Amino acid sequence: MKKTLLAEFTAREGARDEVARLIGDYARAVREEEGNLVFDVYTRASAPRAFWIFEVYRDEDAFQAHLKAPYGGPFNVALAPLIEEDASVLTFLDPLSVRA
């Protein structure tokens, strides 16, 4: 079963450009992971400092491999002082089966 999540955080005032640079570099690395299917980065139209990252991994093993990637820790350390939250807020999603 695919592992899908939404990661959210808000850049501190004056840090948006640095956060955008960091997440751009990180996105390029994550998209190269064998088990990553989607890593799309968005900002909220009405609040451009609010970042939303929609992530999909092939399965739980692929997600665990993502968590162990060597660039994840340094990314989170660099990101932490630039965002309002203590860390990214993660929301795990399950697909809804809808019959046509």
PLM feature spans:
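Terminal low-complexity, poorly structured segments
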Residues: 1, 18, 89-92
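N-terminal first-folded block
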Residues: 3-33, 37-41
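Short, well-ordered beta-strand segments in beta-rich or mixed alpha/beta enzyme
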Residues: 3-10, 40-67
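Short alpha-helical
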Residues: 14, 46-48, 70, 74
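Intrinsically disordered, low-complexity acidic/polar segments
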Residues: 16-18, 50, 62, 99
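An amphipathic, aromatic/His-enriched active-site/gating alpha helix that lines ligand/cofactor pockets
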Residues: 25, 29-37, 56-90
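Glycine-rich beta-strand-turn "strand-cap" elements at beta-sheet edges
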Residues: 41-49, 76-100
